[in-house]
Amino acid sequence: MKKILIANRGAAAARILRAVKALGLQSVAVYSEADADLPYVLQADESYCIGPAPARASYLNQDLLLEVMARCGADALHPGYGFLSENAQFARRVEAAGHCFIGPSSRWIDVLGNKASARELMQRHGLQAGGSTGILPRDDMVAVRQAADALGYPVLIKPAGGGGGIGMIPVHDPQSLSDCWKRASGMAEKAFANAALYLERFVPSPRHIEFQFLADRFGNVLSLFERDCSTQRRYQKVIEEAPAPAIDRQAVAGMAERLSAILGKIGYDVIGTVEMLYTPDSGFSFLEVNTRLQVEHAISEAVTGVDIVQAQIRLAAGEKLSSVIDRPPAVAGHAIEARLYAEDPVRFLPSPGVLKAFELPPPRPGLRIETGYARGNRVSSHYDPMVAKVIAHADDRAAAIRELTGALGAMRIEGIKTNIPMILQVLASERFQAGAMTVDGLQAVISTESVKELA
């Protein structure tokens, strides 16, 4: 592996570029017309425009990405997260062209990247999972209604081929099912070029706990412990932390060990995250497997000292796990990540625009900021509104909260609105401080008037 094409944008592309350079490999960036002036485009060894702003014409354009790979002589492709990262057809095409797809083998994306088949496989291996359907016919509302009635309301509509909360819509009554189904299908098609949907029984007030794994192609699996991603808005993660606070450590360790055994038994490879729902009464329930790098990987890197992106690249290239990570990792301290979105913090509407000011605290021990933007860049309405990730790492959770709060308060961002006021209010809330957030708990700790004052 000598040259890697980075098939992504924004903070994901910037992070992968840093790992590629650290490994001494050549880098190729691709960009849409809307992203031509983003910093990483200029920092890569080579850069190629792949079309107009809409994702379907650029970052989801499989033919054009493969054409650029052939033209520039890249021998590997890193898909990042989102876009085509869990598209098994694209992974197969990359492999068939003689290139390395830097992720799990396409067969695992086929089986586990598809949320419905992943549940079936994990249930066969003994994991508890809430009620769900298989993939349902897109245009057969009679079948969809029958499936929803069988599960019992409320239900959750979920895309089978994507993640990040995009296209996930709770439905509380039969009357709204049809409209929600059409809306979710359109969102999934636009974001992932895959409109397939299924239904899941809605679980009230769970915590979202996920387990990070690395694996080689020789049957070895390594757990990088867990993350708590319970602070969400509309099923999109806002704040993540590692390790999970205020939880039964024995139960967490037992689940990590059990998942490692399952992944090793089936021969899973390279990188993956197993997402679970957790309630004190019911314990862990399987949710899905993300067959890709996660947005929130940085908090696991902070507490373990493992560079997950470099490890992913080396494992995809065929190295053994023991040569990539030479000693068993342990958790050191506590890390918290906040996702900064270009959105109105009161009404939660997108806030695209030009970054007239983008002043971030300089990196220092205990503080890391990931972004794909700089002052003067335009935050486009065509893509996910995340403009930066801010990661604080300290000896304990209270110190990490203070570090993150201070960093967010020191930022000066003008030209767009951001969710910083909302994040600050969450960090200061009694519920967050107690480690008691659930996936539906964000609204309970947000005061519109207080957010207005902070904004």
Predicted regions located by residue number:
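Short acidic/polar active-site loop segments enriched in Thr and Asp
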Residues: K2, D75, Y153, D269
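ATP-dependent carboxylate activation and anion-phosphoryl transfer catalytic cores
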Residues: L5-R15, A19-A29, E33, S47, ...
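Residues within well-ordered alpha-helices
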Residues: I16, D37, L65, F90, ...
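A short, GP-enriched loop/loop-strand-helix hinge that lies immediately N-terminal to
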Residues: I6-A7, V20-S58, V68-N114, Q128-I135
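A conserved helix-loop-beta module that forms one wall/lid of the active-site cleft
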Residues: E95, H99-A160, G167
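Short amphipathic alpha-helix with an adjacent loop that forms part of the alpha/beta core around
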Residues: A57-A70, V144-A150
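Short small-residue beta-strand/loop micro-motif enriched in glycine and branched aliphatics
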Residues: G130, G165-G167, Q294-I299
